[in-house]
A protein has these predicted regions:
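The feature marks the mature, well-folded catalytic cores of soluble enzymes
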Residues: 2-200
Length: 200
């Protein structure tokens, strides 16, 4: 939703200021919080849509990434943490949303939408993307992502205390050349230093 605050739970988009609708997995209807969320959306005239044919709540992780120009980038969603739960993997996003009027490009890289932080002319991801694409060199992965998303890839170290390897739990884009990061000083100062070094 254009100019709305970022809503992380179950959204399609990753670049919130360039979007005009908030999308949720249809699974959200089974949660008690949905009534309150829907009330807020309707009260504020925020357009929203429930996505059918999803296999898990976290639409942000498997739905295509929206670029600032309104086009979409689809990727291979097959994370290591769901290998024992294949029934939870939404692999055909075209069943969830009508992309016929949208340009959608397929990216031959295994990744999660939760590991993608669009930050102006840059995209921030953890190095989990490298471990999930061991058949490709870092250079090839970097080139493919940068070409598809149209911006420079910044790779930060993965916080191994979090099995998903998602950058969205570590950093938040605020404005050009400014991000917020988790307060790692008390729990992992070496990781904090590595993150700051990667972001500079």
């Amino acid at each position: 939703y254009k100019d709305a605050p970022y809503h992380g739970m179950g959204e399609v988009q990753v670049y919130p200021m360039a979007t005009d609708i908030v999308c949720f997995s249809e699974y959200i209807k089974s949660y008690k919080c949905w009534a309150d969320i829907e009330t807020v959306l309707r009260t504020n005239n925020i357009p929203y849509q429930l996505l059918p044919e999803t296999k898990d709540l976290w639409a942000r992780d498997f739905m295509p990434i929206q670029r600032p120009d309104g086009t979409f980038v689809n990727y291979i969603y097959n994370p290591d943490y769901l290998q024992k739960y294949q029934d939870w993997i939404t692999s055909d996003v075209r069943k969830c949303f009508d992309f016929t009027s949208k340009k959608i490009t397929d990216l031959d890289i295994v990744m999660d939408g939760g590991n993608v932080i669009m930050a102006g002319e840059k995209v921030i991801m953890t190095d989990k993307v490298l471990s999930e694409n061991k058949d490709k060199s870092e250079e090839k992965i970097r080139r493919a992502i940068e070409q598809a998303l149209g911006c420079e890839l910044v790779i930060i170290p993965w916080d191994k205390g979090e099995k998903y390897g998602h950058a969205d739990g570590m950093v938040r884009y605020v404005e050009p050349n400014h991000v917020l990061i988790n307060y790692y000083s008390d729990i992992d100062e070496p990781l904090r230093e590595k993150i700051l070094k990667a972001l500079k």
